[in-house]
Curated annotation (Swiss-Prot):
GO terms for molecular function: AMPylase activity; ATP binding; magnesium ion binding. Mg(2+) binds at N251, D260. Keywords: ATP-binding, Magnesium, Manganese, Metal-binding, Nucleotide-binding, Nucleotidyltransferase, Transferase. This is Protein nucleotidyltransferase YdiU. Pfam families: SelO (PF02696). The keyword Manganese applies. It comes from the Bacteria. Its EC number is 2.7.7.-, 2.7.7.108.
Length: 491
């Protein structure tokens, strides 16, 4: 059975300075451990073909499928605020692009596929643990309804990688609407290659924002569009307690998808200053700082686009600043609208923002569990029973002051209690990929070659808004000895 990929590649048709042509490095004994069958079908691929030995070889990079044009993409980036003029795909290869069943062009990329010209002394490989983490979290984000790259497959390579100790090697097949980043623009801007910036901008407009192609000022409109998508994306993150952990400009997608899950984590107890990433020692990418960092990253994109705005540099700067000034309102509108939905408020009145903030203050005072607080408020909205949500607060004084204000506000809404509770359950998940659960899954796979815990967690997270009583343990926060205090970059 020949594995068929209906490749229609566009990025590989750009000039050679946009990438390096490099094939994945073959591995010893690839074995498929997970295939995302629904995603495969959505991409126009045959899952049965991918589950063959030949399919595993392709997904591990041992065999290059017909029609692929493997490349490592060039990009630069600000890493923790420090500019690095050349980064690029150091352990990933873009096999090519397919047009999915909805007419959307999607990249198919192998992560952990071996060294490239951008590897910078690295081995280009990935360990099994980070591959499983990205698979779990990216698919959980998709199930939550948050724009994200996707995971098509995970394959073990039959080889070991060395990260202080020997670990099983693995390859993740990542799917994205594109892998073009703010750092991709920075790569060419740093080289003062205005024509390449223009070519890249035209490609992004054609691929992601085709409605802008015929507008009078397409590059201004492109900046506006990327700002709008990032504002909505960061609001989505905050509404589920997600901390990206490494919001460098090379990890900021111009398509508005969450990309690069390295040290990401979901909060358990609410703390706006929460940091998990082991390398974020000063809290640059802390939970509540993410909107500010997104704007900082977008400002770097605007700097790259300035030469396309016109010959009058001062005027171009004013126009870029005006666009960037719109980010705060767009983020706030999206975030506040999301918070109203989470609180069961379907109309907007003055005082809603202070009401939400008062709840966060009460949660922060005792580090109440972020996810369960909102889920149990959903139940309380229907039943009138506040005891389950109060049980999450070691000292419920702040919550007890807040609950009457909330109920008084709910009385102004037209919905019945049952309607309100049902709507709240659709935006307040019961299940998130909690750090201690991910670590348990990784331990079972790495130490015992046991993927049953991975399969079970993945299945539960595919239905985050359903109660799933048989799996209620997955909704619980960690015990003190289960808490994960730090996460690490991996893939």
């Amino acid at each position: 059975m020949t594995v068929h990929f209906p490749f229609q590649n566009s990025y590989a048709a750009l000039p050679d300075n946009f990438f390096a042509r490099v094939a994945p490095t073959p591995v010893a004994a690839p074995r498929l451990i997970k295939l995302n069958r629904p995603l495969a079908a959505e991409l126009g691929l045959n899952p049965a073909e991918l589950e063959t030995a030949e399919g595993a070889e392709i997904l591990a990079g041992k065999t290059v499928p017909e029609g692929a044009e493997p490349i490592a993409m060039a990009y630069a980036g600000h890493q923790f605020g420090h500019f690095v003029p050349q980064l690029g795909d150091g352990r990933a290869v873009l096999l090519g692009e397919v047009v999915d069943k909805n007419g959307v062009r999607r990249d198919i990329q192998l992560k952990g596929s071996g060294p490239t010209p951008f590897s910078r002394r690295g081995d280009g490989r990935a360990a099994l643990g980070p591959v499983l983490r990205e698979y779990i979290v990216s698919e959980a984000m998709a199930a939550l309804g948050i724009p994200t790259t996707r995971s098509l497959a995970a394959v073990v390579t039959g080889e070991q990688v060395y990260r202080g100790i020997a670990l099983p090697g693995a390859v993740l097949t990542r799917v994205a609407t594109s892998h073009i980043r703010v750092g991709t623009f920075q790569y060419f801007a740093a080289r003062q290659d205005v024509e390449a910036v223009r070519r890249l901008a035209d490609h992004v407009i054609s691929r992601h924002y085709p409605d802008l192609a015929g507008t009078e000022r397409p590059y201004h409109a492109l900046l506006d569009a990327v700002i709008a998508r990032q504002a909505k994306l960061i609001a989505d993150w905050l509404l589920v307690g997600f901390i990206h952990g490494v919001m460098n400009t090379d990890n900021t997608s111009v398509s508005g998808e969450t990309i690069d899950y390295g040290p990401c984590a979901f909060m358990d107890g609410y703390d706006p200053k929460q940091v998990f990433s082991s390398i974020d020692e000063f809290g640059r990418y802390a939970f509540a700082n993410q909107p500010r960092i997104a704007l900082w990253n977008l400002t770097r994109l605007a700097e790259c686009l300035l030469p396309l705005f016109g010959d009058d540099k001062d005027q171009a700067i004013k126009e870029a600043e005006a666009a960037l000034d719109g980010f705060a309102a767009q983020f706030t509108d999206a975030h506040q609208a999301g918070l109203r939905r989470k609180l069961g408020l379907f109309t907007q009145v003055e005082g809603d923002q202070p009401l939400a903030q008062a709840l966060f203050d009460a949660m922060a005072a005792v580090k109440a569990d972020f996810t369960l607080t909102f889920r149990r408020l959903s139940d309380a909205a229907g039943s009138g029973d506040d005891a389950p949500v109060r049980a999450l607060f070691e000292d419920p004084t702040g919550l007890d002051e807040w609950l009457p204000r909330w109920r008084q506000r709910l009385a102004d809404e037209p919905q019945t209690a049952a309607e309100r509770a049902a709507a709240m359950r659709q935006v307040n998940p019961a299940f998130i990929p909690r750090n201690h659960r991910i670590e348990a899954v990784i331990t079972a796979a790495v130490e015992n070659d046991d993927y049953a815990p991975f399969e079970e967690l993945h299945a539960v997270l595919a239905r985050p808004y359903d109660d799933q009583p048989a799996f209620s343990a997955y909704a619980e926060p960690p015990q003190p000895d289960e808490r994960v205090l730090q996460t690490f970059c991996g893939t």
